Design a protein with these regions (language model features):
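Positively charged, low-complexity terminal tracts
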Residues: 1-21, 25-98
Length: 98
């Protein structure tokens, strides 16, 4: 399990490394373009939802537990980017087959 650490939020958010690697690419693409967006996920214990406003001016860190980066699924990246560009903001959608 990796961690997303966002200085605008509270506690680090635990996210599986494969998912976190895909989210990292979406975050970096949006922030490179200067596009703030919302990101919603569940707490590590899934007891509540966490909504974050992701903005280029706030520090962001991705911590991975694995030593090797996972293979990126381009179809999943596109689905996540579509979600990030929607009015609801970025939500983790199920990974489609390659």
């Amino acid at each position: 399990m990796g961690k997303l650490i966002y200085k605008g939020g509270g506690q680090p958010i635990e996210i599986e490394d494969r998912t976190l690697a895909h989210l990292r690419l979406v975050f970096m693409t949006k922030l490179r373009r200067g596009e703030p967006f919302s990101f919603a996920t569940h707490s590590p214990m899934a007891t509540h939802r966490v909504d974050l406003w992701i903005h280029p001016s706030l520090p962001l860190q991705f911590h991975f537990t694995g030593s090797r980066p996972p293979r990126i699924n381009q179809r999943w990246m596109e689905a996540l980017m579509d979600s990030a560009n929607s009015s609801d903001g970025l939500r983790v959608v199920p990974e489609p087959r390659y």
